[in-house]
């Protein structure tokens, strides 16, 4: 994808902020990714979710204030982010509302809370907030976050009709020069909104439009999470593929051979001067 040109002065501010912070060491990455609090099942998905390469691409640093949007009931990325920033940074997890009318959301929130409570040495400093627009959108103090990250959630926000609210909330909490990192199942470029909502795949054009409407600049993209075996067209949408495998045993080996979905990885910046 051809990226829009970012003004040199603005881009240098984003880069300068990243280079001035202490980096996560290779030893720390290895320690976190192989830690006992990560289940074997979750670690087995590293080959598809590429947490090391993805978080390095987004520029996550140990002293960052990070907001993770909708970590879900399992908190897959929370397992990695929490220990990375625990020493001198801060992690906010903007979760589903516990008073949601949607049973899935309230159940996932309860599962996530139990996960945090069960491992205080890992998650004791994590601050749990609520993201359920339009009722809840105060996900962290305004202008305090270095990074806001979301993994495979945009299709859910589109379906709920709250995508614009979420991107606005992300913009609000970021510092000037802060980074919004988005990983999402990637649809064909010409996919309609109806197809995106039903399939779980979203076009890059759609994500970029949402981010830019909120005030963000597209800084970079990566193929870290791409999967050329995935043609984006399956009977049960993205949930046909692992780990969901919605068709059960039907064509199971076929979909296991494809692997997890083809995903975009986009990095946006909040301008220093709005």
What is the predicted function of each stretch?
Residues 29-57, 61:
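Class I SAM-dependent methyltransferase Rossmann-like catalytic core
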Residues 63-73:
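Conserved class I S-adenosyl-L-methionine
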Residues 82-83, 163-176:
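A short glycine-rich, Lys/Arg-flanked "PGG" loop and its adjoining helix->strand segment in the class I
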Residues 92, 177-185:
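Conserved beta-strand signature within the Rossmann-like core of class I S-adenosyl-L-methionine
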Residues 105-136:
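S-adenosyl-L-methionine
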Residues 138-148:
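A short acidic, Gly/Pro-enriched loop at the edge of an enzyme's catalytic core
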Residues 193-219:
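Conserved Class I S-adenosyl-L-methionine
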Residues 255-274:
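C-terminal lobe and adjacent flexible extensions of AdoMet/dcAdoMet transferase-like proteins
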């Amino acid at each position: 994808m051809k990226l829009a040109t970012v003004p040199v002065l603005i881009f240098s501010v984003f880069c300068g902020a990243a280079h001035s912070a202490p980096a996560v060491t290779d030893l720390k990455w290895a320690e976190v990714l192989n830690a006992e609090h990560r289940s074997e099942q979750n670690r087995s998905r590293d080959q598809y979710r590429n947490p090391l390469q993805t978080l390095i691409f987004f520029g996550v640093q140990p002293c960052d204030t990070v907001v993770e949007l909708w970590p879900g009931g399992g908190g897959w990325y929370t397992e990695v982010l929490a220990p990375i920033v625990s020493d001198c940074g801060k992690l906010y997890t903007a979760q589903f509302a516990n008073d949601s009318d949607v049973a899935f959301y309230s159940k996932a929130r309860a599962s996530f809370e139990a996960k945090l409570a069960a491992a205080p040495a890992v998650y004791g400093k994590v601050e749990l907030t609520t993201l359920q627009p339009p009722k809840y959108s105060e996900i962290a103090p305004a202008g305090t976050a270095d990074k806001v990250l979301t993994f495979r959630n945009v299709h859910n926000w589109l379906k709920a009709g709250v995508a614009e609210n979420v991107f606005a909330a992300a913009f609000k909490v970021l510092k000037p020069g802060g980074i919004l990192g988005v990983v999402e199942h990637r649809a064909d470029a010409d996919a309609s909104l109806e197809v995106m909502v039903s399939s779980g795949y979203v076009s890059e054009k759609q994500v970029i439009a949402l981010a830019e409407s909120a005030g963000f600049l597209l800084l970079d993209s990566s193929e870290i999470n791409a999967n050329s075996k995935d043609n984006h067209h399956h009977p049960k949408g993205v949930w046909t593929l692992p780990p969901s495998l919605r068709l059960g045993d039907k064509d199971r080996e076929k979909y296991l051979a494809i692997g997890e979905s083809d995903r975009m990885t986009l990095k946006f910046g909040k301008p220093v001067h709005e």
